[in-house]
């Protein structure tokens, strides 16, 4: 399994950066995980957008889904998608988003008179906590995490043997449920948005130190910090996580590729 970082910024983009977006690939299967501001342009630097099998959205905040709009326009109007000038079988990727997404998409794009743009361009399916699905050679599971709108951590594993596991924590405050869901992950990607915890009200984000603590409790093999601004010192963030997690820690960078190897101990006998 291979994960490519297309965008790792929080709600405001880094200079020349993009918000949340990751390619998850195994064998011939290609899934785009989140599609925030700037991600569609970054996707085109790495892959043919028409070759994406499915898009998975962790939650309905703009920095995680807004570039579905240019993606949908490309799928609808690009010359290659027209029978007269392009393919006779235009691409229509699956789109998996949380329950209620269809209505929200319609309200967002309906503001300029194209309320069904996204559901026509994509094969839209809504999911909830505890759901499982298969996309090509990948198997996905979803678990609710604490954030300001319904948000789900996503686990990717091989549908063939389940041996390689990548867990994406999405946007989340501190969560015992997230720790349990990520137990034993080969690669755990957690947000590290804030230098210090929110002081008032509901928690919806982690600090680098909290990400490290969660990774240790989840017995993860490797930790990648993401959803982190270029205004936050990378070496400091890494050191904060390393205070609590003894495994390898990396701060996500656009263009970085992470391989998730099959662990022999997890292969079926």
Residue ranges and their predicted role:
Residues 1-48, 151-170, 187:
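Conserved beta-strand hairpin/beta-sheet module of binuclear metal-dependent hydrolase folds
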Residues 4, 96, 123-128, 141-143, ...:
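General small-molecule cofactor/ligand-binding pocket signal
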Residues 29, 84, 89-93, 218-222, ...:
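A short helix->loop->beta-strand "cap" motif at the edges of active sites that frequently abuts
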Residues 32-36, 53-63, 98, 166-172, ...:
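Active-site neighborhood of phospho(di)ester-bond hydrolases with catalytic His/Asp-centered motifs
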Residues 38-93, 187:
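Active-site metal-binding motif and surrounding structural segment of the metallo-beta-lactamase
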Residues 81-82, 88-93, 98-124:
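Active-site neighborhood of divalent metal-dependent phosphoester bond hydrolases
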Residues 113, 126-184:
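Catalytic core of the metallo-beta-lactamase
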Residues 174-259:
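Cap/insert and terminal regions of metallo-dependent hydrolase folds
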